[in-house]
Amino acid sequence: MLLGEQTGTTGHFSKISSSFSALVAHWRSYRHIHRIALVIFVLLTIFVLERYRSALASTFQTSTDPIAVPGGNSAAQDNNHYEPYPEANQGGGGGGGKHEGSKYEQMTPEQLLELSQKNAGNSTLGFHAIKYINMKARYDREDAMALQAYMSGLDIEDAPAVEADEIDPAGMPPTHRPGRLRVGEKGCWRAHANIWSQMTRHRLPPILILESDAAWDLNIRSIMSNLNTHFIDFLNQINSTAVHDPSYQSPNNHNVHGSPSYSDNGPIKPNPDDPWLSEHWDLFSIGQCFEYSQDREIKLVYDDESVPAGKEYWGKKMGKERVIRKSGGITCTTAYAISHTGAAKLLLRGAMDLDNPVDLLIRRMVMSRDLVAYSLFPPVMAQWEYIGGIGMAERGAQSDINGGKHRDTPEDADMPGWKDVQEKATIWQTKGHHHDVAFERMALKEAWTEIMGEGPEKLGESLWNPETGD
């Protein structure tokens, strides 16, 4: 072989080297374009990952449904719980979110209680939501709700009432007492049942349900915050245990609000994610208009500066105090909290036999102890009505359930009540038959002073023109 003559192998590598050199030269000539393309690719990848992160996480996340293990108890069954409250992790209500064990395990009992009290006085009073039921034509009640919520810092949601023209006998449950309920009472029951049904379907945390004529104290948030610690004490005092939970795959699952707040070996602990410890009750009434005597001795009395002194609890004179008690059966559904277990029970009872108005159904279930229920005396909420003699009674505006007259006030109506309006700077008062009401600062009565920033003496100038008499 002559010097300088290429062998086959040498020629092959020479071609590879030439190709590689050409590739490098190509890359160098277009390197800026390649870099831009690479940057675009990286940005698109980040965008796609961020956009679909939740979906990807749920795809690869281990299921939280119970693992089916035949026979007996097992670690798999103990550690994998069905989550009945998917909405609870979205916030709101009692602190908003799943109560993971590590979340509070470093906190002292005092810190836990302080956080529970804070959440019990939040904008939904520690509940998942506050819903009020209102007829679509009652704009006056809509406005009264808005004013109270505005002044007291509450976050409230409207729940449509069921109107008379929406009631079809074919869609009503059976009853052993045909003709017992008026159409308005059927609609009232159904409006409450719609909320119970939603809670049962979605296994929602407790909701506070209000009638649209509910009234409360201007300082309702601090009142409920103060109540919270005493309510926990009350549950401990009566050795409360968690109620039966029949939700799917969970007859004894009490992780519905996160870590259970109860313990078989110790006292009930505060749960900031569920300040009212709703696994211990079905119904908690804070606005009944009457209460029966049954179980009245199962109670806890505590100091509350917002309660005017002088009320009587079954013959015993009280100071500035409030009573937490085991309910003896309520009348009126002005304001009550309901847990998902209570919602399911009430939904079932009405579906089986709709033989009474909604508050009497509740009363019967409480008195028969089918509902685990607690209440307050005096209640922290009550019904309002218009001051007499201003023309609203003539319209039938004092009650929806009994049916209004649906006519305007006659031009020649006698209306002496407007003198009271001018003196008191309010058109609202608590209903006369609510003898147990004890507001220190009823929000609606304080509305003119709070919102206008002036006393009753200025009201006349706003309502009446002294020159024209209008």
Where are these regions (language model features)?
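An acidic/histidine-cluster motif and surrounding catalytic segment
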Residues: 2-210, 214-470
